[in-house]
Amino acid sequence: MKFIIKLFPEITIKSQSVRLRFIKILTGNIRNVLKHYDETLAVVRHWDNIEVRAKDESQRLAIRDALTRIPGIHHILEVEDVPFTDMHDIFEKALVQYRDQLEGKTFCVRVKRRGKHDFSSIDVERYVGGGLNQHIESARVKLTNPDVTVHLEVEDDRLLLIKGRYEGIGGFPIGTQEDVLSLISGGFDSGVSSYMLMRRGCRVHYCFFNLGGAAHEIGVRQVAHYLWNRFGSSHRVRFVAINFEPVVGEILEKIDDGQMGVILKRMMVRAASKVAERYGVQALVTGEALGQVSSQTLTNLRLIDNVSDTLILRPLISYDKEHIINLARQIGTEDFARTMPEYCGVISKSPTVKAVKSKIEAEEEKFDFSILDKVVEEANNVDIREIAQQTEQEVVEVETVNGFGPNDVILDIRSVDEQEDKPLRVEGIDVVSLPFYKLSTKFGDLDQNKTWLLWCERGVMSRLQALYLREQGFNNVKVYRP
C-alpha cells in the first residue's frame, strides 16, 4: 500500500531552506509515529509531497488514521501505483478501479501530470472520461458538482490511481517551533489550547496543579496522555504535577475573599514559570478566554501576567465557549472535560473583576512564599510515555488477568469509533461496551454482582480507569490483558 502526503499550504510558501527543514522534520515525525505499526514501513520525502509505503495490509486503516492526526499534513491520498504504456492503458486501469463506484453516478475525471509525455492532462481527462462514459452505461459525465470525482496522477511512466482522499489537521510539524508548557486542568479550554499549539508546531509539555486529590490527577493524566497519543506522539514530552493544595490552603486562610481568584492564578503562573525555566521552555499556554470568568478580564489578565517574564500564550482569548466546546468535540476531549471537576471556580464567593495592583500586592505580603517554593521543588515530573508504567505501579491492588471466570464480564472501554472499527469478540465470555469517558457516571448502573475486566488495546486507559474506579469504591474491577 502507498500513501501520498500533501503538505500544509503554509509550508509550501516558505523559503527554500525553511521549507526543506519543515519537510525533513515532518518526515521524521511520520516515521516516529508509524514505526509502531509496521517496522518495514518506508517514508520518502520529495519537494512537494512525502510518500509512505508499507507492506502490512492489516495495518492500512491504522496507518491512514494516524497520518490524519499528524500536524503539518494537509491531506492524504491513498493510491495504487502501477506502470502504464499509453492513454488507453490508463483508461483500462481506471475502468477496473472505478467501475463499481461509478455505477448509477455522475462523474468527472481530474488528472495531475508530471514528467515528459506526448499528451496533456486535459487529453487524459477527455480520453479516460469518454471511455468510462461509454463502458459504464449507468454513469454520466458531469463536470460541475459530480457525485464522484475520479482523481488520477501521472508521473513519468507511473500511474497513481487515487483510491481515497483523507483530510489531515494541517498546521506545522511538531518541532518546527519551540517548546511550550501548557497549564492543563482537564477542562474544555486547556485541552483545546494545548491542541492548537501542537497543531502550530510546538512540542507541548503539561503542567497540572492538583487541587482535588488523586482522582483529579488521574483524570487530567488521561487527557494529557490522550492529546499526546493522538496528536503529538512523535515527540517525548513531560507531565509535571504540582500538589497545589498547600498553596490553596494558605490563600484561603490569609487572603481576602475578593482577591483569591487573581492571586491563585498569579501563584500558578509563578510556579509554572519556574518549571518552564528549569526545563528550558520558552512560553506558557493557558486556555483563558476574555471575559469568560472573573479572573479573565483584561485588568486581571494583565496583573496575572505581571508576575512573570515568561511569555504567556492564550490561543483561545477571543473564542466563545460554544466554539471551544465544538473544537473539544472535534479533537475528542469533550467527554473528558464534561466529567472533570472544576476547583478554581469555588475558591472565591465574590471575586473582583477589576483587581487593583496595590491591593493584590498587599494581600500577597501575607502569603508564605516558602510554601510555593516547596511545592514546585517537590513537583512530580514524568515522561508522558511512562504514565502507563506509573499507573501500573499505583494500581498494585488491581489485579491484571489474562483469563476469565464464570462471573466475569469484559468491559470494552475504547471510544465508540474504535469499537465500531474493530469490535471486540472473545469466545466464552460476554463483552459489554462502555467508553472510558462514561465510566464515572455509568459504571454504577452495571451489575455490581459481576466482576468487570476492563480492556483497551494498549492497556493504558484500562489501568488509569481501574485506579479511578477503585478510588470511587468499586472493588469488582480487574484489568484484562490477554
Curated annotation (Swiss-Prot):
Residues 404-482 form the Rhodanese domain. GO terms for cellular component: cytosol. ATP binds at L183, I184, K265, G287, Q296. The keyword Chaperone does not apply. Keywords: ATP-binding, Cytoplasm, Disulfide bond, Nucleotide-binding, Redox-active center, RNA-binding, Thiamine biosynthesis, Transferase, tRNA-binding. GO terms for biological process: thiamine biosynthetic process; thiamine diphosphate biosynthetic process; thiazole biosynthetic process; tRNA 4-thiouridine biosynthesis. Disulfide bonds join C344-C456. It is found in: Cytoplasm. It holds the Pfam family ThiI. InterPro entries: Rhodanese-like_dom, Rhodanese-like_dom_sf, Rossmann-like_a/b/a_fold, ThiI_AANH, ThiI_fer, ThiI_N, THII_Thiazole_biosynth_dom, THUMP_dom. Residues 61-165 form the THUMP domain. It catalyses: [ThiI sulfur-carrier protein]-S-sulfanyl-L-cysteine + a uridine in tRNA + 2 reduced [2Fe-2S]-[ferredoxin] + ATP + H(+) = [ThiI sulfur-carrier protein]-L-cysteine + a 4-thiouridine in tRNA + 2 oxidized [2Fe-2S]-[ferredoxin] + AMP + diphosphate; [ThiS sulfur-carrier protein]-C-terminal Gly-Gly-AMP + S-sulfanyl-L-cysteinyl-[cysteine desulfurase] + AH2 = [ThiS sulfur-carrier protein]-C-terminal-Gly-aminoethanethioate + L-cysteinyl-[cysteine desulfurase] + A + AMP + 2 H(+). The active site is at C456. SMART domains: THUMP. Catalyzes the ATP-dependent transfer of a sulfur to tRNA to produce 4-thiouridine in position 8 of tRNAs, which functions as a near-UV photosensor. Also catalyzes the transfer of sulfur to the sulfur carrier protein ThiS, forming ThiS-thiocarboxylate. This is a step in the synthesis of thiazole, in the thiamine biosynthesis pathway. The sulfur is donated as persulfide by IscS. Belongs to the ThiI family. This is tRNA sulfurtransferase.
